[in-house]
């Protein structure tokens, strides 16, 4: 199958981004803008396009970094690989073609690689994975289940319905909270990048209160500067009638899907229910702007999970992360080093709990640096 492999050069971003945006599913983490974000932290991108079966080509933006002093590089395909379509009948050829591309072209471009981690945004038991077809295909191609880096489940809101139907999908109490915030004079505004400092202050307060790790302010500026020029990012604030920002969301888009990976609120925002109005407006205006789905990005637990479920949508469980081990010793050493790094970072920031590599969002993905 090697004669059908195509290596997309790093500067062919327009072709690549079009492929990802048209994929089913596609993810903002597979866009060239995300590679631009991660390049600041020493990650390089290798874009692979393989196979040409019934489901079309399968491709992945592979982020690669060699953490010192290890001699191996780690490779990660965040929310990929992606394809124009997935079917149970075509899964075996697709997985095999992508594994071959990793073993050959990736080694050629990136050198000594311990393992490649993938986490395709495919629903477990969904149409593509009927009777476990994709999971069987991944195993047959040499992949094995691995610890997750990104959320292994989420809640997706279908924006095909009209606004009245979306409003009706909110729990009654949630609609009351939205109206309460409006009555209190809370408004939602789109903002420019010059307000990222305010975003970060609220996000930091939220992280300290909830006990999760976030990155530096510059990291979120990098996200904004990579996606916003292409019309793929929005910064929203819920403000009191006095103009005080009390809740915020940073949204990112790929194709028809809007994702909310970052957001938070102040204590005052919680008291005024501004966060309810903010999320409703994010959903409503995303539909207005032509989006077809809204990803709440993870299910979380406890109060956050309860909050998200009140906005409707459908709970989706993904196939999870899978490793293609290219060097068994390197894979073992990398795993131990990553776990130790997470513990050190949690202690440095004074956060309780054991933590894990997945809790740290895994370098090439979310809030890890």
Label the predicted regions:
Residues 78-91, 160, 263-272:
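A short, internal acetyl-CoA/4′-phosphopantetheine-binding micro-motif in the GNAT/acyltransferase core
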Residues 97-104, 222-335:
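Aromatic (often tryptophan-rich) hydrophobic motifs at membrane interfaces
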Residues 108-124, 286-297:
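Conserved GNAT acetyl-CoA-binding A-motif
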Residues 87-93, 123-132:
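Short, flexible/disordered intra-domain loops and linkers
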Residues 3, 7-54, 58-70, 120-127, ...:
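A conserved beta-strand-loop-helix scaffold within acyl/acetyltransferase catalytic domains
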Residues 68-73, 85, 124-128, 303-305:
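Short catalytic/ligand-binding loop motif for oxyanion handling, primarily in non-cytosolic enzymes
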Residues 89-110:
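Short secondary-structure subsegments characteristic of cysteine-rich extracellular domains
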Residues 2, 9-13, 37, 135-164, ...:
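Active-site/acyl-donor-binding loops of N-acyltransferases
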């Amino acid at each position: 199958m090697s004669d059908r492999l195509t290596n997309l050069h790093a500067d062919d971003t327009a072709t690549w981004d079009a492929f990802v945006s048209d994929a089913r599913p596609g993810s903002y983490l597979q866009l060239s803008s995300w590679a631009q974000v991660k390049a600041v932290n020493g990650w390089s991108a290798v874009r692979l396009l393989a196979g040409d079966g019934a489901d079309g080509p399968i491709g992945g933006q592979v982020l690669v970094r060699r953490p010192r002093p290890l001699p191996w590089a780690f490779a990660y395909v965040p929310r990929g690989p992606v394809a124009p379509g997935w079917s149970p009948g075509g899964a075996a050829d697709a997985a095999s073609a992508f594994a071959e591309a990793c073993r050959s072209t990736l080694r050629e471009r990136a050198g000594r690689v311990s393992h490649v981690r993938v986490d395709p945004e495919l629903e477990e038991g969904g149409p593509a994975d009927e009777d476990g077809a994709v999971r069987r295909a991944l195993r047959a191609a040499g992949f094995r289940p691995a610890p997750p880096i990104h959320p292994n489940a989420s809640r997706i809101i279908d924006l095909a319905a009209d606004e009245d139907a979306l409003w009706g999908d909110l729990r009654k109490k949630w609609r009351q909270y939205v109206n309460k915030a409006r009555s209190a004079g809370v408004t939602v505004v789109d903002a420019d990048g010059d307000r990222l400092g305010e975003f970060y202050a609220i996000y930091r307060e939220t992280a300290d209160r909830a006990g999760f790790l976030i990155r530096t302010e510059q990291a979120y500026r990098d996200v904004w500067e990579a996606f916003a020029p292409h019309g793929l990012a929005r910064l929203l604030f819920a403000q009191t009638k006095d103009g005080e920002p009390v809740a915020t969301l940073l949204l990112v888009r790929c194709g028809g899907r809007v994702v909310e990976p970052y957001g938070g609120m102040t204590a005052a925002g919680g008291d005024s229910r501004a966060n309810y109005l903010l999320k409703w407006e994010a959903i409503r205006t995303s539909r207005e702007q032509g989006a077809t789905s809204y990803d709440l990005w993870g299910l979380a637990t406890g109060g956050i999970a309860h909050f998200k479920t009140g906005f409707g949508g459908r709970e989706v469980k993904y196939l999870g992360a899978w490793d293609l081990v290219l060097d068994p010793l390197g894979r073992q050493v990398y795993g131990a080093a990553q776990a130790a790094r997470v513990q050190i970072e949690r202690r440095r920031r004074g956060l309780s709990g054991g933590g894990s590599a997945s809790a740290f969002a895994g370098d090439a993905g979310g809030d890890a640096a």
